[in-house]
Amino acid sequence: MHVLPALLLPPTLPGLRKRLLAAAVASIVASTPAGSAWAACSEAPQAAQLFVRGTMNNWGVADAYKLAWQCDAYYLNVDLNGKYEFKIGDAAWSEQTTFGTFHQQFAGAQTIKVTFAHGKPQIAVGPRSYVDPDTAVPTDPVALSLAHDSRSLADKAPFGAVKAGSEVTLNLAALPGITKATLVIARRTLEGNQEVLSYAPVARVAMQRQPGKNRWSATYRYADIGVYGYHFEVEIKGRKYLYQNNRQPLYWTREQGVNGTGTAQAVVKGQTIRPFRQTVYAPDFQVPAWASDAVYYYIFPERFRNGDRANDPKPGVTRYHDQGIELHANWLDKPYRPRSGDGSDNLDNNDFFGGDLQGVIDKLDYIRDLGANTIYMTPVFQAASNHKYDTADFRNIDPHFGSNADFTRLTVEAKKRGIRVIADASFNHSGSDSVYFDRYANYRAQGAFRGEHVDPASPYADWYVFDTKQTDPNRQYKGWGGTVDLPELNKNSPSYRQFAYGAPDSITRLWLQRGASGWRMDVAPWVPDDFWREWRKVVKAERSDALTVAETWFDSSKFLLGDTFDSTMNYIFRNAVLDYASGVKAGTAYASIEMMREAYPPQAFYALMNLLSTHDQARSLHVLGDHGNDPAAAALARQRLRLAMFFQMIFPGSPAVYYGDEVGVNGGDDPLNRATYPWADLGGKPDLALLADVKALIAMRAAHPVLRHGSIDAPLLLDDHVVVLARRDGGTWAITATNNAATATTVTVTLPAGAPAGPYVNPLDGSTATAQDGRLTLHIPALFGAVVIGGAK
C-alpha cells in the first residue's frame, strides 16, 4: 500500500473524514447496564455487521471488536486502557454504515453500548455489564477438561499445513463422561480486505474413543486446496459443548484465534464459532530456491540517491495532475507534510528530491557490502506522484527516474554483484493522471475519462466502471480506498487482463524480459483470486525462477496455497517482533509467529519477506520510542532495533532492510517514513556504529546456512522476556536466544533429541558453550540475543 497510513481506511484519508462526520453526530454518555430495563425488543437497525474500528485495532476489521445486537442496542465488551479514536463501521467501510469519529478514555474492563436514534449512533461507555454468550465459561468439569493442541503431534498429525489429498488425524482429550464427540470440518471463504469472511460446512466426522484412554479420535482427508476450519462438538449429560480456537488476536487479522490450545464453551443460540484453521496447499507448490537465501534491500527510489540531476522534476514545468510540483533544494530536508504549516502547498505526494535509478546503480556496491542480495523497489513506472503507485504508463520508466534502458542496466549491474531486482506494480488501479484514464487531459491518447468526460469509444473504456448518472466527477468512478487519484481498474475486463498478463507483450512478461527477477504485487486482496491464478501461470511460464510476492497484511494463508503467490510482505512478523522488542511479553508476541509456522506451507514460510520498516508504516526507530527529542530514548530505540534485526537474521524467511534503517534513519507515519538516505557526501550523518552491527548480523546469516534453511519447532523456552529456538540443517544445529529485558540473563534449556553436546560456538563473539547431561546454558545480553552453532560443519 502506498497512500493510506494504515492497512484500512483511517480517519485522515482525504475526503473520507468530512463525509463520515457529516453522516452522523454522536456523543459519549454515561453507560446504562445491559438488560437493566429492557424496552420492547426490536430488529437491529443496520443490516450489515458493525464493528468498532479505530486506533485500538489499526482501523481494521476484527471479530474481537464486533458489535452484538441485543434487543435494543449493540454491545461490545472491551479491556482497554488509555485514549482511543474510533468509528462504528461495517467490514467494507460502506459510506452508509460508517458513523462518527469518537474519542474515548478507556479504563480497563468496560462495555461499549451503541444505540441509534434517527439513524445516528449514541455511544455509552461504562463498567462491564454485557454478558457475551461467546465468552461464557462452562461449569461442567468434563467440559472444562476438554483439551486439544493443534501444534502437538499427539493431538494433530501431521503438523501444520498439508498437501491436498492428505489425511489429518485429530484427537481430543477429556475426563470420562462424554457420550458423543464429533469433528466438524468447514471451508473458509475470505474475499477482499477481509470484508467477506464465512465458513461453509464440509463434513461431520464421528469421533471414536481410543481403547483404554480418555481420548477421542477422527481422521479426515482434505481433497482440495483451501483454508479450512475445524472444531469439536461433544455431548455431556445431554448437553452440547464446543471446543474451538482461542481468543488471542492475530495481528491485522479479522479472525480471532492463533491455534494451539483452544477453549470450551456451551452451545448457545447466536454464538460465533472460532474454528482452528487448517491450510491445504497444492502438492506441486514450488517456491524459487533462492528465496530462502534472500536478504532484501527495500528502496523507495525517489528518496534513496540522486544519480542524475538532469532528470530531476522541474518546478513550473513538471505537472502533478493539473497542478505543479515542489522540488527540495536540500537533499536532507524532511518530506513536506501538506496542511502542517511547514511552508509547502496543500497537495499530497507532489514534493520531490530527485532520487532515480542511476542513484541505485551508483550505490550497488554499498548494497552488496551491506550483505543484501535482492533489491525490492517500490514502483518505477511513469506516474505523477513521488510514490508512483498512481501509474500513468506501465510500459515505461518514469522519466524523472531514468529510462527503460536504465532499468535493464540496473538489473545487469546488480546481477554482476549477485543481486536480484524485484519489480512492483499495482494491477488493482491506475492513476487518474494516466494514459488510460487521463482525467486532466495531459495525454494525446484517448483516455477513458479524458478531461473528466466518459469516452465509450476509448480503447480503455471497459478498464473502468463508470456511473454516468452522477454529476460530480469524483463520484463517477470508484477510487481505491476512496482516493480519486487511484481509479480502480476493472479486473474482469478481458482487454485489461490481456494487457496485464495475457498478451505476449503484457506488462507481466515485459518487465521480466527487461531483467526483473520477480514481482511484488500491490494491494493483492483487492484483486480477484482467479486473476492471480492466471497471472501466476504467466509469470512462471516466462521465468520459472521468478518470485511472486503479495502485499497482504493479515493472515496470508489463502495466498500461499500454490496457485497464486510464493510469498508475502510479512506485516504479522513486523508487528510481533517490534512489539517484542518494545517490551511486550514474549509469549504474547510470539503466538502470532507460531500461528504462521503452523498455517503457512513450509516452502512459503521460509520465503516470507520478513520486514520491520516499510513505506506504509512508521519506521522501526519511531515505533521503538525515538521521537526525535530525547537522546536517551533514541539510544534505547537503537538497541531495541538491534534486537529486532537480530531476530530477523536468526529466523526462517527473507529479512528485509528498509533503506536507511541500517544507519538510523527515523520517521513517523507517511510521509516522514519516506525520508532521504543521509549520505555523508551530501552532509548527512549516518550512524556508522549501527551500520557495522547490521552488517555483522547479515554476514552471520550468510555464513551459516542453518540460520536460513534450518528446521524450526516450538520454542525450547518461552517466558516473559526470552525466546530460545533450535534450528537444524543436516548435522548442524543452531541454538538462538533473544532477550527483551533491560538486564542480561542466563537460561538453561534442554536440547532436542539428536542435538550434539557441543562445543557450540557463538559466531558474533567467538565464545563457546557445551551441554551437560543434555542441558545447555546460554548467557543473553540485555535487549539483544545470542546464537551458538555446533555439530557438523
Predicted feature residues:
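Active-site-proximal helices and loops of the catalytic beta/alpha 8
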Residues: 192, 408-420, 428-445, 506-509, ...
